[in-house]
Amino acid sequence: MSRLRLPARARPKAAAPRADGWPRAAFDDGFRVDSRLVGGFELAPLSLELMAETERDAALEGLAAFEDAIARPYLLLSVPADRPPHEHLSILEERLDGRRAAAGFSAYAALYRELCAAATRPLRRTYLLLDGASGPELGRVIATIARVAEERGLVVREVSPNEIAGIWGDVARAGVPHRIGVHTGEGDGLLTALALSRRWPAEVAPGWLAGLFAVPGIAAVAMRVRPLARAEAMGFLTTRLRQVRAAERIAAERGELADVERERLGATATDARRAVHAGSGRISFVDTVLLLEAPDRATLAERTEALRLEARSLGVDLETASFRIADAWTAILPGPAPRPIAERNLDSASLAASLLNVASDLYEPAGHLYGRARTSGAPIVLDRFAHASHNAIVLGQTGTGKTMFSGAEMHRCFLRGVRILAVDPLGDYRRLASALGGTYVELGAGDGLNPFALVGTTTERSLSAKLAMLDRLLAAMAGGLSRDERPALDRALRASYTAAGILPDPATHGRRPPTLADVVERLAAEPEGGPLARRLERWATGSLAGLFAASVPLPADRRVLVVGLAAIGDPEVRDVAQLAALSVLWDLVRADLSPKLVVVDEAWKVMRQSSGADFIEELARSARHYHAALQLATQDIVEFLRSPFGEAIVKQCDLRVLLGQTPEGADALVRFFDLTQPERRALVHARPGEGLLFVGRSHTAFEAVVSRREYAMLTTRPADLVAQSQLKCEPPDSS
């Protein structure tokens, strides 16, 4: 497909017309078509098909209000998106650092190319384009539209004159001569134009036209919208209502039965007239045209018939623009509107429901792969660090792919240069850490940590933050604190740090920190602290002393650092150790502003105690301030959502992944996320890796996918692990 790429300062000759009245395009002080300046926006896609009902209604209400605010004619244009695999892969490749990242990228790139090639529904971009006589006039209109879009929560991006020139060149097939016939245009291939008939179904679902986009060969879909002024709309509706009433009287005089279709038209006209009179809606004339292309006549006939069948299934007919192919083609081009092809009236709600920017896939090229959309097969690429909250939560039952998903997220963030910090309760990420050249610290198997150490701290507030964290940790060790024990613990902690020479001054933070045994000794010396000291004794000097008495702090400079807890047999001890590990990793997070991913598997285990839940909620709120992304995963869905902190934590996560559920878990998610019954059934019957992916206000059905290299590093299936041990080889370096 040829493209017209015009530099901003160039002044080329206008394109020669290929039919009478063909528009002329050129650069002057911007991109002009027939001397009219053209500008506009790209509209972000809306994933309506799996939005909850209330969310979908709110989105359509905002879209209707946005379109009502545009008082002049405009063009809604949907064209195929040019999204080659290298657009995303080249961005990721620039960030690779080291041999291990390069090896992982090779497998990742192969997987991504495979997904791009297997997509069943072409990706599309949707534009809202207007024209004006002068730059100041068009600029004022564009500024107004941008402001209204922001007020209504719609994401739009102003397109440059060069981009509009490229769109015009693509749709006009610039540089490729075409001979216009009765039914087709013939050049290097064949194309035809079809228009939606004026008779539409009485009721439509939001985004109902999206089904037409799945037919191969759709080169462009355009809606020419001509809003009517209030007086003009009232006159039109009054005339329409009089016609209906007159027809009803004539039918009654003839003794004919009431016509249901006529009654519907009368009721619709009455409701629309009241809405326009009250100023709560607008009437627009809309002309909808589709451009269909094919390499030969047989294929064109086949695609035309497929498009007609799809349209009939939606309750509308398609009419070929016979003898008016040039007019219909011109109607799709950016610029002033030509003569209408099959114009009909729509109210605000109907126009919003017929939106062209509907999508079921998500694409942010600076991010990384999350899976593929179930409806289109298109790869889902997201950049979590580009969202207001970088956090994510993964909810799924055992065996639904939580570990595989979280491990793949760690690996792909590593490829982007993000530092990986993780707490691994079951030892699932040991092979991943080894393959990435990271450090794996296994508590209970000879390794330990010292939660009292101040690692990488640079401010005077660091000591106060450490004392607050230790208060939570020791409360968890002791099974809670009484009203008298809390001040006693605070005094013992402060005295221990002072005795070690560590003060609020950051210059003292590198000194040897106190130990839990030091704190317990000071508690035992106080009357109020005696019972607490006895409850902490086994952690300080008893059988568990080795867990938190490491003399060397965790390495602060490792790209990948994972703390494993699988060697700790006691579940209660493991929960406390998980909280301690998180506290140490949190010190590393606050040490600098480099991008970091903090993964907490089995998060509910640490949240069962109020001190742990409070700390997780604080991490979720504060992570973005340190350029960190928190990723939580749990299988205890019902307990998590019912907890006092569960809702607050989920609200701090812009990315929410729902994998396979039990019926009880699915019911809890239906209530919490306002899911539909089809979505509930999909979660109950989901295979491993299948589920729903929420991104901000949108969500879509998706399937998580991994390369063979990632699978080898992350699988927990016993059969796979036995096979790997028998082969006695490292995970493969490429897929």
PLM region spans:
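Glycine-rich phosphate-binding P-loop
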Residues: H387-E409
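Conserved nucleotide-binding/hydrolysis micro-motifs of P-loop NTPases
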Residues: P45-L48, A81-P84, L426-D428, G446-G448, ...
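Generic beta-strand/beta-sheet core signal
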Residues: E293, A321, G371-A373, L382-F385, ...
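Extended, folded cores of ATP/NTP-driven motor/assembly subunits in large transport
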Residues: M1-V358
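P-loop NTPase motor core of the ASCE superfamily
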Residues: E114-A117, A146-R147, P161, A392, ...
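Pre-Walker A (Motif I) flank of P-loop NTPase domains
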Residues: A378, A386-A392, R559
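Walker A/P-loop NTP-binding active-site region of P-loop NTPases
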Residues: T403-A453
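P-loop NTPase motor domains
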Residues: F31, F41, E53-A71, F213, ...
